[in-house]
Curated annotation (Swiss-Prot):
Top-level taxon of origin: Eukaryota
Residues the entry annotates as binding ATP: 40-47
The gene coding this protein: CHL1
Binding site for [4Fe-4S] cluster: 260, 278, 288, 330
PROSITE patterns listed in its UniProt record: DEAH_ATP_HELICASE, HELICASE_ATP_BIND_2
Motif (DEAH box): 373-376
Protein name as it appears in the record: ATP-dependent DNA helicase CHL1
Enzyme Commission number(s) of this protein: 5.6.2.3
Catalytic activity: Couples ATP hydrolysis with the unwinding of duplex DNA at the replication fork by translocating in the 5'-3' direction. This creates two antiparallel DNA single strands (ssDNA). The leading ssDNA polymer is the template for DNA polymerase III holoenzyme which synthesizes a continuous strand; ATP + H2O = ADP + phosphate + H(+)
Protein keywords: ATP-binding, Cell cycle, DNA-binding, Helicase, Hydrolase, Iron, Iron-sulfur, Isomerase, Metal-binding, Nucleotide-binding, Nucleus
Biological-process GO terms, alphabetical: establishment of sister chromatid cohesion; interstrand cross-link repair; mitotic G1 DNA damage checkpoint signaling; mitotic sister chromatid cohesion
Domain Helicase ATP-binding: 3-438
Length: 830
């Protein structure tokens, strides 16, 4: 069997794809390996290669996993421990035979579902058309209009709240039950079921998987793209002699905002509002018509049909929402139930990287394969999930909202609500006074206890206020009321908040309530008060300890040293696999130029030199505009919005901007301006000649691939070092230097570590920006690194391998332009 066939790739894979798949497979086969860092440039089929390698390994090894004594005896008692080995082996063979027969029966059933012309599920059917489902009739309130008007005051009034919220509701008690207790109740309940339901429930054990693949990515669209790639594949059965055809059991997990099918809940616009509304509906007397946290619901005919319909084919997140609608089954909770039955589960970063969310979802990573895509974002994402910030203006706005709300609904709020709203307003006042009194500059570190110590406020009060916010759902009621009030007063200008303020305050208070030595409170510009996690490795270590292997994949993973330092500082090198592949394009389709003339030095001290800006920089872009064919666009990246604005202003004053615009239409990204991409794309499509100035780390530097004619040349203007005077970087640097000194390092060592830290941030941004230029094997482009500091060997070592390997020997503007012209002449001749 050749390698291409071995991995069941749907196409004829490139050599680099075969190398990647073999590397991942070998890593999974080696129990010593815990982490793999895989770099595969944009356009090289990374996602499909990851699917083929991980799922091939799983199918190759599932038979051994299933036949293991531990697996077969997982639900048995210890009564067989004293039996002879031949008795145990016979028993084991009998159990395995029964499991495989049941699995074969289940696969045939799924095939019938897939082939039926009139499926049980008809996509696009509305909930209202399913009124015939007697066991889940939608209440009259669910048929009410979706939009909430300001006159619907009942929607905004907090339900009666007792004491300090220390009591536990029936709903919370039910949902706090352990998985084992839930399963015990389910078994007890199943004994009361009719034979039809028992028959349906038989397949639950047939589809159990001891090892799963968890695939996590940053955005909803990336996870949907994964589903589309998975549809292309076809894998053989793990048990070819016993089970002829084995479908891939794929379950996508999403938020309630994506999956909720209850009209009373869906009408709320924010994720936080939907979560609170869902909880309130479930705890109400009527409950939710689509979900009850009972063994009867979890083992019902409709819930089992949901599993089977989802597993009968590959469905993305929108598909399973429609499956839930058609069966009148909550797809959010049903999907969670069938994680153990899945081979592959996709989930957003938040679900994987938050320990509390994993616990809530009962995500068991033990022995499984975890694949994290776009992993260059991982450190920032972990820090962001576990950090919080609240500004002085937001605190004042929230305080005024609480006072307004209390005045409006004072007579309708019970004493428990009034008392706790007063406590909340007092706590906000404490934060307002602290910022007003103590703010001096960004980066000033703050002791968490000092925030509260001078105001007769303690952590117990913070805990009680948080309990109130969580159990009363006051946040979504108050914030939605204020938003509707603002819309009524100025409907044309009001934009809905992406995250209501009370939720932001709640997250900040949670950080204050659970202070950690691995994080720090400090001031930022605004002014604002911020908590930031400084040691993401502890959060990530829990995942590494549970999983069989964690694969960190991305198009641009350099500098890898930073990733290892922050995520796995204690992991031995022998436990880590590093893989970086070249690009699929021919070497002749990409060149990298380092423009190494002494005048091109965009340091903070020199970058605003009139001679540099109006002479050397302008002439470089003007000459480049005449060198690159008008059929192709030029992307010029700048370190910041502020610097690009200064360049544009300088060129306009000198009459240079119009000169460049005449040669090639100029578009540029503005911080608060309209998106220039559509007009730029149109100009390129019309072969008018166009140039687009964009910002490193801005809206156009990530997530958009400038393939084809959109990017025949990409220029990095300077090195995009971060703002070292931001509060975040001041605190990060201080923490890093203290860590080096506490570890026995010298002051020089600490300074070098800080220099390396800033350099790594810079080069990660460079790699992300230039990585947008190539999309497919037939693409071609030129990369210009416009700063003499790029000639530094340490800087070059942190470029992505496929960029670094194509650095040309020429370095003057004259020679670079001549080589560029030759490049396009050669392309035209091929």
């Amino acid at each position: 069997m050749d390698n291409a066939t071995k991995f069941h790739h749907p196409y004829s894979p490139y050599d680099i794809q075969l190398d990647l798949m073999q590397c991942v497979y070998d890593t999974l086969a080696n129990p010593v390996k815990k982490v793999a860092i895989v770099e595969s440039p944009t356009g090289t089929g990374k996602t499909l290669s990851l699917i083929c390698s991980t799922l091939t390994w799983l199918r190759d090894n599932k038979a051994d996993i299933l036949s293991s004594v531990d697996t077969l005896h997982s639900n048995e008692d210890d009564s067989h421990d004293s039996e002879p080995e031949w008795v145990k082996d016979t028993y084991k063979e009998s159990i395995l035979k029964d499991k495989l027969e049941l699995l074969d029966e289940y696969e045939k059933y799924l095939e019938e579902l897939h082939l039926k012309e009139n499926k049980i599920i008809k996509f696009g059917t509305s909930i209202e058309d399913k009124s015939k489902v007697k066991r889940r009739k939608v209440t009259s309130s669910s048929k009410a209009k979706i939009e909430v008007s300001i006159e619907d005051e009942d929607e905004f009034v907090a339900k009666p709240y007792e004491s300090d919220g220390e009591e536990t509701t029936d709903l919370e008690k039910k949902e706090a039950l352990s998985k084992e207790v839930q399963e015990l109740l389910a078994k007890f309940d199943s004994s009361k079921k009719n034979t039809d339901n028992v028959e349906l429930g038989r397949f639950a054990s047939a589809s159990q998987n001891q090892v799963r693949i968890f695939f996590s990515s940053r955005t909803h669209s990336q996870l949907n793209q994964f589903a589309e790639q998975l549809k292309l594949t076809n894998f053989p059965s793990s048990f070819p002699d016993k089970v002829a055809h084995e479908r891939v059991k794929y379950m996508p997990l999403g938020s309630k905002k994506q999956l909720c099918i209850n009209p009373d809940v869906k009408k709320w616009k924010t994720l936080e509002g939907i979560n609170d509304a869902c909880s309130e509906v479930r705890r109400s007397k009527e409950g939710c018509p689509f979900y009850q946290n009972t063994p009867k619901w979890h083992n019902s005919k409709e819930t089992n049909h949901f599993r089977d319909q989802v597993f009968s084919d590959i469905h993305d997140i929108e598909d399973i929402a429609k499956v839930g609608e058609s069966l009148a089954v909550c797809p959010y909770y049903a999907a969670r139930d069938f994680i153990p039955s899945s081979e592959i589960v996709t989930l957003p970063y938040q679900y994987l990287l938050s320990e509390s969310t994993r616990s809530q979802l009962r995500l068991d990573l033990k022995g499984s394969i975890v694949v994290i895509d776009e992993a260059h974002n991982l450190v920032d994402t972990i820090n962001s999930i576990h950090s919080a910030e609240i500004s002085l203006s937001e605190l004042k706005q929230s305080y005024n909202s609480i006072i307004l709300y209390m005045k409006k609904f004072k007579s309708r709020l019970n004493p428990g609500n009034r008392v706790n709203l007063l406590k909340l307003s007092k706590l906000i006042t404490v934060l307002i006074n602290f910022i007003t009194t103590h703010y001096k500059k960004p980066g000033l570190e703050v002791d968490a206890f000092s925030i509260l110590e001078s105001n007769n406020t303690d952590m117990l009060n913070v805990h009680r206020v948080l309990k109130y916010i969580k159990t009363s759902h006051i946040a979504y009621k108050l914030d939605t009321y204020i938003q509707k009030l603002q819309e009524k007063e100025s409907p044309s200008n009001q934009k809905p908040s992406s995250q209501p303020l009370l939720y932001k305050i709640s997250k900040f208070l949670e950080c204050l309530n659970n202070t950690s030595s691995e994080g720090s409170f400090f001031f930022e510009r605004g002014p604002s008060l911020r908590y930031m996690l400084l040691e993401p490795s502890r959060i990530f270590q829990d995942i590494i300890d549970s999983a069989r292997c964690v694969i960190l994949a991305g198009g641009t993973m350099e500098p890898v040293s930073q990733l290892l330092q922050y995520l796995v500082p204690k992991l031995d090198d022998s436990s880590i696999t590093k893989f970086s592949c070249n690009h699929v394009i021919p070497d002749s389709h990409l060149r990298t130029y380092i423009v190494n003339e002494p005048q091109f030095e965009f340091t903070f001290e020199k970058r605003n030199s009139v001679n540099l800006v109006q002479n050397h920089l302008f002439n470089f872009y003007l000459e480049l505009s005449t060198t690159i064919p008008k059929t192709g666009g030029i992307i010029g990246f700048f370190p910041s919005y502020k610097y690009l604005d200064e360049i544009i202003v300088s060129w306009r004053k000198a009459g240079l901007f119009e000169k460049l615009d005449k040669e090639r239409k100029v578009f540029y990204e503005m911080k608060d301006g309209p998106d220039p991409l559509p007009d730029y794309t149109s100009a390129v499509a019309n072969s008018e000649g166009a140039i687009l100035f964009a910002i490193v780390g801005g809206k156009l530097s990530e997530g958009i691939n400038f393939g084809g004619n959109l990017c025949r040349a990409i220029v990095m203007t300077g090195l995009p070092y971060p703002n070292v005077f931001s509060g975040e970087l001041i605190i990060s640097r201080k923490h890093l230097e203290e860590k080096v000194l506490n570890g026995g390092g010298s002051k020089t060592d600490a300074n070098m570590a800080a220099k390396e830290f800033f350099e790594n941030i810079c080069m990660k941004a460079v790699n992300q920006s230039v990585g947008r230029s190539i999309r497919s094997i037939n693409d071609y482009s030129l990369i210009y690194l416009l700063d003499k500091r790029y000639a530094n060997a340490n800087i070059q070592s942190k470029l992505s391998q496929w960029v670094r390997s194509r650095i040309q020997s020429v370095s003057t503007v004259r020679d670079v332009m001549a080589s560029s012209k030759e490049f396009f002449d050669q392309i035209a001749d091929t």
